[in-house]
C-alpha cells in the first residue's frame, strides 16, 4: 500500500540521518519508539545502533 511504502521511506531516511548526525542513544530510542513501526526497520535500527530493548 502507499501508506506502507511511505513508512518504509520515512524509516530509511531516519536510519541515514541518525547515522550521519551521530545522534545520542536517547535520541535514537525516542525515534524508535515514536517513528518506527515496520519490523524490518526496527531490526535494522537495533542492529545499526546496538539498541537493546529487552
What is the predicted function of each stretch?
Residues 1-54:
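Divalent metal-dependent phosphate-bond-processing catalytic cores, especially two-metal-ion Mg2+/Mn2+ enzymes
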Amino acid at each position: 500500500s502507499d501508506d506502507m511504502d511511505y513508512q518504509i521511506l520515512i524509516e530509511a531516511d531516519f536510519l541515514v540521518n541518525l547515522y550521519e548526525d551521530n545522534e545520542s542513544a536517547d535520541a535514537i530510542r525516542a525515534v524508535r519508539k515514536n517513528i518506527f513501526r515496520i519490523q524490518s526497520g526496527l531490526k535494522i535500527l537495533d542492529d545499526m545502533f546496538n539498541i537493546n530493548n529487552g
